[in-house]
Amino acid sequence: MPMANVSGVRLHYIEAGEGVPLIFVHEFAGDAESWQPQIRFFSRRYRTIAFNARGYPPSDVPDDPAAYSQQQAADDIKGVLDHLHIDKAHVCGLSMGGYATLHFGLSYPERALSLEVAGAGYGSDDPEGHKRDSEVVIRRFETEGMEKTGDYYAHGPSRVQYLEKDPLGWKEFRDQLVAGSAQGHALTMRGVQMKRPTIYSLEARMTLLEVPTLIVTGDEDEPCLEPGIFMKRKIPTSGLVVLPKTGHAVNLEEPDAFNRAVLDFLTAVDAGRWRRRRPDSLAKSGILPAAR
């Protein structure tokens, strides 16, 4: 079973395909296998990699809460790339993985060919409410275990869209979630989810980001919609895709639309055709051209 040793923690990874590297970073309620619809599609064109975050078996589940943080999540992406002797890669993350992808780009821009940041922003509009909700879920992981808490989490307000559209796909998602580690999820939520900075607090750093970036969100993923628009406005090299009637797990809920949007983006980046936003498109008037 392939493992990358990152700061003494073993991270399980999977690979498929050849070509330019494309690494996938999973969400809180997923793991590397959550990217199978993308791995099967993109491995025809790219060297695809996906890994289980720390806390997600068969990756190690460190007991020390200090082993889990937002920066560590970004560093783990770098660690997997280092293990595979990959200098630069396209990086695609969802939710928790989207945050990690953004922070990877901010911390190690020289290692990123592009960033695909999907479903990122939860907690930014109401940080205190986010912390309260997280405490509820953490206590459930610690007292009720993975089966009951995972099922509870899978019925969240941005998950029910998937349940309605594709009950069989949603059940696969739910079954994969409840097979995880309650301890790992509790530690991850406490160390990463609860303590990460809001998207809005990253404004100054995002305005300096020159890595080509694609932001993807579902229009019914309420906690991520406004942060997605904010990122589009602040990252000068970014584009925004909003998928209609779609919740949080955009890569699973709408795999064809997600794959097509990401492929079009990667094709433009690889061809050198994804550029910064034109300054004259930022004129205050919606009609009058910017002064020359």
Positions of predicted regions on the chain:
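Conserved HGGG/HGGXW glycine-rich cap/lid loop of the alpha/beta-hydrolase fold
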Residues: 7-66
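Acidic beta-to-alpha connecting loop that harbors the catalytic carboxylate
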Residues: 18, 219-221, 245-247
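Short beta-strand/loop motif that positions the catalytic acidic residue
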Residues: 209, 215-217
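Catalytic active-site module of serine/aspartate enzymes centered on a nucleophile-bearing elbow/loop
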Residues: 238-292
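Active-site loop/oxyanion-hole signature of alpha/beta-hydrolase fold enzymes
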Residues: 40, 49-92, 96, 260-263
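Conserved alpha/beta-hydrolase "acid-adjacent" motif
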Residues: 222-227
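Flexible "cap/lid" loop of the alpha/beta hydrolase fold
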Residues: 102, 106-107, 112-145
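Conserved alpha/beta-hydrolase catalytic His-Asp/Glu region
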Residues: 126-132, 143-205
